[in-house]
């Protein structure tokens, strides 16, 4: 019988029969800026489908990731990864904090994608952390930071092209990475998910917001938006 190991705001991790494997289940829960948790019926099923599809695509271009296979509508089998305590945020268009903190016009397109690191902690409200702090805290080595940045940009470039092909702009995405050990050596591996929960997606022509950005102002449109993204990706 599988044992619950961890429950987050939108996913649950369970033990699997084999060592170093886990079962990741996608729930319908979503967290608002106020901290309130709401249910969007069917969201977990769509996120499982979308993330499975995108992780498979990334594997095809040589991006190591934790996804192994989809088990059922809500669950997937994943590789155990020692997850880094940081999130990697890649942005190519001014949104969110760039508008609030720097006064940049929303929608302004950057010359090159910008990478930010945040501490992976809801308790501390995901503060920005720089490379020198990451090194001094002992979270990653210099080589690991370099590898994470290179992989993050490659992933973002690939996903941007894929989404453009279905009429959607990838404005920003949040990625998580970790280590997988093979004897004394380790490799950097993409983990978590890639879905409308952690990607900022806009209609390419109208800049109409899709995915999680609708939670606060238009919650009744959230499922429809996730379904649209899933349907568009089926065309690829």
UniProtKB/Swiss-Prot annotation:
CDD domains from the UniProt entry: SAICAR_synt_PurC (cd01415)
HAMAP family assigned to the protein according to its UniProt record, in alphabetical order: SAICAR_synth
Similarity comment: Belongs to the SAICAR synthetase family.
Entry keyword Secreted: no
Keyword match 4Fe-4S: no
Pathway noted in the entry: Purine metabolism; IMP biosynthesis via de novo pathway; 5-amino-1-(5-phospho-D-ribosyl)imidazole-4-carboxamide from 5-amino-1-(5-phospho-D-ribosyl)imidazole-4-carboxylate: step 1/2
Record-linked Gene3D superfamilies: ATP-grasp fold, B domain (3.30.470.20), Phosphorylase Kinase, domain 1 (3.30.200.20)
EC number of the protein: 6.3.2.6
Encoding gene per record: purC
PANTHER family in the cross-refs: MULTIFUNCTIONAL PROTEIN ADE2, SI:DKEY-6E2.2
GO MF term set: ATP binding; phosphoribosylaminoimidazolesuccinocarboxamide synthase activity
Single GO cellular component term: cytosol
Domain of life: Bacteria
Biological process annotations from GO: 'de novo' IMP biosynthetic process; cobalamin biosynthetic process
Name under which the protein is recorded: Phosphoribosylaminoimidazole-succinocarboxamide synthase
Catalytic activity field: 5-amino-1-(5-phospho-D-ribosyl)imidazole-4-carboxylate + L-aspartate + ATP = (2S)-2-[5-amino-1-(5-phospho-beta-D-ribosyl)imidazole-4-carboxamido]succinate + ADP + phosphate + 2 H(+)
Coiled-coil residues: none
Originating organism: Rickettsia rickettsii (strain Sheila Smith)
Keywords: ATP-binding, Ligase, Nucleotide-binding, Purine biosynthesis
């Amino acid at each position: 019988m599988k044992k619950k190991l961890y429950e987050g705001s939108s996913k649950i991790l369970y033990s699997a029969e084999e060592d170093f494997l886990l079962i990741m289940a996608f729930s319908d829960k979503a967290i608002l800026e106020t901290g309130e948790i709401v249910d969007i019926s069917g969201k977990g099923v769509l996120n499982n489908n979308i993330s499975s599809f995108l992780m498979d695509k990334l594997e095809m271009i040589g991006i190591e990731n934790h996804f192994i296979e989809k088990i059922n509508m809500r669950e997937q089998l994943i590789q155990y990864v020692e997850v880094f305590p940081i999130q990697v945020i890649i942005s190519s268009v001014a949104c969110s904090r760039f508008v609030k903190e720097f006064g940049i016009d929303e929608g302004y397109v950057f010359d090159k994608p910008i990478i930010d690191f945040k501490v992976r902690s809801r308790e501390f409200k995901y503060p920005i952390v720089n490379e020198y702090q990451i090194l001094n805290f002992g979270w990653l080595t210099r080589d690991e930071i370099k590898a994470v940045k290179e992989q993050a940009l490659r992933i973002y470039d690939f996903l941007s092209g894929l989404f453009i092909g279905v009429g959607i702009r990838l404005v920003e995405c949040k990625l998580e990475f970790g280590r997988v050990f093979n004897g004394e050596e380790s490799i950097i591996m993409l983990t978590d998910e890639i879905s409308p929960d952690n990607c900022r997606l806009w209609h390419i022509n109208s800049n109409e917001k899709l995915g999680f950005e609708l939670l606060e102002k238009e919650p009744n449109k959230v499922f429809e938006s996730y379904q649209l993204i899933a349907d568009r990706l089926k065309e690829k």
